[in-house]
Amino acid sequence: MSDLPAVVVGLSGGVDSSVAIASLKAQGHPVVGLTLWLMKGKGQCCSEGLVDAARLCEQLGVPHHIVDSREIFEKYIVNYLISGYANGVTPLPCSQCNRLVKFGPMLAYSREQLGIDYIATGHYAQVKYNPTSDRYELWRAVDRHKDQSYFLYDLPQEILAHVLFPLGQQTKAETRALAAQYGLPTASKPESQDLCLIEAHGSMRQFLDQYLPRQQGEIVDVYGRVLGYHQGIHHYTIGQRKGLGIAAPEPLYVVALDREHNRVIVGDRATAGRRECTVARVNWVSIPPPKEPMTATVQIRYRTPPVPVTIIPDANAEQVQLEFAEPQFGVTPGQAAVWYAGDRLLGGGIIQPFGTPTLHPLEATATHV
């Protein structure tokens, strides 16, 4: 009998989670597969993924459990998205899903139903215990291109203490090679490129149009000139350039969403830059909440490079002010700002709305162009 602890492995039916469970089994861990049934209706992640995960566990000769998580997914993700877009922000569902739908409920199910204290997933990230601070630290994956620590910033210490990331120290190419070596049926399965909701509904716009009414409004520049019309501010996000449906002599970007007046405000790239923003719902991961300002690097979107920042915490550090060394393009309310010291994730939170910019009409310019 193995001395290694038993692990419940979250399975999506993809190659990453398949290699995670196969690798842990090869190391000698007793393993159990667990798949969350997330979405109502038909869709890849609520049908094909379940079938592929079940087949994988049958091939590996390990138990497979399916947990019906459709209600909590609807409550914490679908409703969260709809509410956010309706209020003119661009929510980040993945970090909220990881905390409230996946990791938390997975660990609870593992302990309460199976008596197992550890869970694992196919995420590319690393957890390291620091005995000096007595904290479980979250670090970037070795494969920087695949690193998913940004989406995991909201996981609390009580979860990080009981989670394993078997893929954190290998590249995606090595994962594919292991899948072939293990003879896994998912070895050649193409990688998912979109949110599960987008895969199921075709696009975020199609998904949102099922819930939010189309309401025509103006697209204006920072001088208040009407450049065109939109069919709903939920179709737009800060920093967006493509798909604006307007003609202009220079590239224009969404710089603000004015929910009160149902307007999309556009400007040039310089207008879209911001030197600071407020971040709330902060989770301090690898360090305790600081009492004084500190410097770090920050990512304001998943694929944006980290940039220097000064972090100014409030009294209890549950909210911070970020001051960027240089103006940053695409700072978007609703998205996560996640700060690092090198590859160590320090903390993160949600970028807050920063008010509608004051428009400055040009007296000698016609209202419409």
Swiss-Prot record:
Its EC number is 2.8.1.13. Its main location: cytoplasm. It catalyses: S-sulfanyl-L-cysteinyl-[protein] + uridine(34) in tRNA + AH2 + ATP = 2-thiouridine(34) in tRNA + L-cysteinyl-[protein] + A + AMP + diphosphate + H(+). ATP binds at G10, L11, S12, G13, G14, V15, D16, S17, L36, G122. Disulfide bonds join C97-C196. One of its GO terms (biological process) is tRNA wobble position uridine thiolation. Residues 146-148, 301-302 are annotated as: Interaction with tRNA. It is an enzyme of class 2 (transferase). One of its GO terms (molecular function) is tRNA-uridine 2-sulfurtransferase activity. The record marks H123, Q335 as: Interaction with tRNA. Keywords: ATP-binding, Cytoplasm, Disulfide bond, Nucleotide-binding, RNA-binding, Transferase, tRNA processing, tRNA-binding. One of its GO terms (cellular component) is cytoplasm. Belongs to the MnmA/TRMU family. Catalyzes the 2-thiolation of uridine at the wobble position (U34) of tRNA, leading to the formation of s(2)U34. This is tRNA-specific 2-thiouridylase MnmA. It comes from Thermosynechococcus vestitus (strain NIES-2133 / IAM M-273 / BP-1).
